[in-house]
């Protein structure tokens, strides 16, 4: 036995075994990865080895003390990566990417969120390191570097494992690396650590795209957006011409709370009533990615899709954009954003200059006291009340944007502000969520009253829009309880990406309200609002279309490649009936829309990575 690889390299073998087990345990318990087949389970089991084996194998080139130090450090680093991804996944249902690391400035404002997601059991992931340290102290014996033939055999096996992983990935999802909008599929197929390497390479390629871009790069994109343009409904074009715009972004607000009750009390009584006097959209989807609220701002302003990795507000703040703010400025509109948080959060102070916004009211412009604030900033009621007074001083017409805060993860609220009982389910987060949504709804009601008091209501177009989901897939069991379902399917998860979108034009929509049932998303907001203001968008490079146009093809694509039409929902490589939620026998029915979804996301990425709008007037 003395000549065996295990006997000579016990510390290495134990290090590999423990790291393999830890990674697989995190796959199963830390992430909500959908495993449908035995092949997918096999891939999940073996893919950690295709990274751990070659990395830890470096220890074969080192003598005993250096080898053990290297393996312990490698184990520690990979464990930290696992825990960091688990915490990140707990909120975003996503994995850390390189651009996210440049958002470290946000962490100072996220203390309560990280605390909510950190689990004491994470400490158990370091137990193997303690064992390895004790093992190293008790089993010291002279050791030289491994023989060349041993290293060759070891790396031959490592290469075989890597090739096996890639082959299985290709069988499961052909051309996976070429069409990588779905990070979950990448992690399931090639592994978490390998995904981080792939992401690093992708970001390097994206950075180089800007250097090699030229004026010809924008031509194909112009041709696509011009061909996809939908003419506005002339009966609605210019309905709000000359009016002020008051656009309120509703933090973490999803549509499933609308017209729902807890213990007989409505969660959103004000919005429920306002919908009856407005243009509202039943199948309106959030399309954000890792930038969350900042992504929703970006999408609305530009009618482009956000970056697949990181937040555009951080990674592309030096690029050129043809925002709605700039377009409306040509029609004498003054623009302002109100947000009672620090101006540097999400790099807003820099990006708002890039967007052409005239004025940014941040936390320093508001009167904030311990009693009127939360961990994220000023409470919604006080924020909107103070904002209404500031709004009156702006030059008119104006386009104003407000970003609420109280309904923010982890959805905590003072007892004095609680207007409804918590929901009763297996998720404390969902239980609290209904109370912060209820408070937000009451704050909106109060805001409308203040607008009337300030004389700003009648001559304005008032818009409410949810920015992104608040309750992630990690709480699907409780969500099924809320919705009265046995389980939440992938189809249901897509439906839960619906957010409120309400356009209220006093004197018009209260006389002729309308509920639009067609599929649409945040990318459609820019042309919809511009056309209501009487500003034509034909010729603009935008991927959205006027939601009120009868010429529009109902369609919404999420950033991960899932999409929705009036007939189909496509997600997790499966085509569903939009009406029934059942898996379709004819899976090819979704193919034409899948091509459209991939093309739009790819073209939008080219604009962002190449800074192509600098070549367009």
Curated annotation (Swiss-Prot):
One Gene Ontology term of the molecular function aspect: transferase activity
Pfam family membership, one: Sulfatase
Residues at the catalytic site: 293
Organism listed in the record: Bacillus subtilis (strain 168)
PANTHER family hit by this protein: LIPOTEICHOIC ACID SYNTHASE (PTHR47371), LIPOTEICHOIC ACID SYNTHASE-LIKE YQGS (PTHR47371:SF1)
UniProt-annotated location(s): Cell membrane
Misc: Although its sequence similarity with the glycerol phosphate lipoteichoic acid synthase LtaS, it cannot restore staphylococcal growth and LTA synthesis after ltaS depletion.
Extracellular side: 32-41, 90-115, 172-617
Lineage top rank: taxon: Bacteria
Residues given in the record as Mn(2+) binding sites: 251, 293, 467-468
Transmembrane domains' residue ranges: 11-31, 42-62, 69-89, 116-136, 154-171
Protein name: Lipoteichoic acid synthase-like YvgJ
Entries under InterPro entries matching the protein: Alkaline_phosphatase_core_sf, LtaS-like, OpgB/LTA_synthase_biosynth, Sulfatase_N
Topological category with respect to the lipid bilayer: Multi-pass membrane protein
GO cellular component, one term: plasma membrane
Residues the entry annotates as binding substrate: 408
Residue ranges, Cytoplasmic side: 1-10, 63-68, 137-153
PTM comment, free text: Proteolytically cleaved.
Family named by the database record: Belongs to the LTA synthase family.
Site (Cleavage): 213-214
Alphabetical UniProt keywords: Cell membrane, Manganese, Membrane, Metal-binding, Secreted, Transmembrane, Transmembrane helix
Keyword match Transmembrane helix: yes
């Amino acid at each position: 036995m003395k000549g065996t690889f295990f006997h000579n390299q016990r510390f290495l073998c134990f290090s590999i075994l423990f790291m393999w087990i830890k990674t697989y345990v995190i796959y199963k318990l830390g992430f909500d990865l959908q495993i449908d087949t035995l092949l997918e389970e096999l891939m999940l089991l073996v893919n950690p080895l295709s990274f751990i084996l070659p990395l830890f194998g470096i220890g074969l080139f080192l003598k005993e003390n250096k080898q053990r130090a290297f393996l312990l450090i490698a184990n520690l680093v990979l464990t930290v990566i696992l825990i960091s991804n688990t915490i990140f996944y707990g909120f975003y249902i996503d994995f850390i990417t390189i651009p996210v690391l440049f958002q470290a400035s946000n962490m100072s404002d996220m203390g309560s969120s990280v605390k909510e997601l950190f689990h004491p059991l994470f400490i158990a992931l370091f137990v193997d390191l303690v064992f390895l340290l004790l093992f190293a102290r008790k089993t010291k014996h002279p050791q030289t570097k491994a023989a060349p033939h041993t290293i060759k055999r070891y790396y031959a096996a490592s290469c075989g494992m890597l090739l096996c992983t890639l082959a299985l990935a290709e069988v499961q999802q052909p051309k996976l690396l070429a069409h990588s909008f779905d990070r979950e599929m990448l992690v399931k197929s090639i592994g978490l650590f390998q995904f981080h390497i792939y992401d690093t390479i992708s970001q390097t390629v994206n950075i180089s795209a800007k250097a090699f871009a030229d004026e010809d790069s924008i031509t194909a994109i112009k041709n696509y957006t011009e061909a996809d343009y939908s003419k506005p409904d002339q009966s609605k074009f210019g309905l709000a011409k000359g009016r002020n715009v008051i656009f309120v972004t509703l933090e973490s607000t999803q549509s499933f709370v609308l017209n729902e009750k807890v213990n007989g009390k409505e969660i959103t009584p004000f919005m429920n009533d306002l919908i009856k006097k407005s243009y509202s959209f039943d199948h309106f989807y959030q399309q954000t990615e890792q930038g969350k609220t900042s992504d929703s701002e970006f999408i609305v302003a530009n009618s482009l899709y956000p970056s697949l990795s990181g937040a555009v507000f951080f990674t592309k703040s030096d690029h050129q954009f043809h925002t709605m703010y700039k377009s409306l400025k040509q029609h004498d509109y003054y623009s302002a954003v109100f947000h009672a948080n620090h101006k540097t959060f999400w790099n807003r102070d820099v990006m708002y200059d890039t967007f052409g916004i005239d004025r940014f009211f941040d936390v320093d412009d508001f009167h904030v006291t311990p009693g009127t604030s939360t961990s994220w900033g000023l409470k919604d009621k006080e924020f909107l009340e103070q904002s209404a007074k500031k709004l009156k001083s702006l030059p008119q017409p104006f386009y104003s944007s407000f970003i609420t805060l109280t309904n923010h993860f982890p959805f905590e609220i003072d007892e004095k502000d609680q207007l409804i009982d918590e929901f009763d389910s297996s998720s404390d987060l969902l239980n609290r969520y209904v109370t912060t949504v209820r408070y937000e709804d009451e704050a909106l009601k109060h805001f409308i009253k203040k607008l009337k008091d300030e004389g700003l209501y009648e001559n304005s177009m008032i818009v409410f829009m949810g920015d992104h989901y608040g309750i992630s897939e990690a709480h699907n069991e409780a969500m099924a309880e809320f919705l009265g379902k046995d389980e939440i399917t992938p189809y249901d998860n897509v439906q839960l990406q619906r957010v409120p979108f309400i356009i209220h034009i006093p004197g018009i929509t209260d006389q002729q309200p309308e509920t639009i049932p067609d599929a649409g998303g945040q990318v459609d907001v820019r042309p919809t609002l511009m056309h209501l203001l009487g500003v034509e968008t034909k010729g603009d490079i935008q991927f959205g279309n006027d939601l009120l146009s009868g010429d529009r093809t109902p369609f919404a694509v999420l950033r991960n490649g899932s999409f929705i039409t009036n007939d189909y929902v496509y997600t997790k490589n499966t085509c569903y009936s939009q009406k029934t939620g059942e898996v379709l026998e004819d899976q090819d029915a979704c193919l034409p829309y899948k091509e459209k979804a991939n093309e739009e996301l790819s073209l939008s990425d080219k604009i962002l990575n190449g800074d192509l709008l600098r070549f367009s007037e």
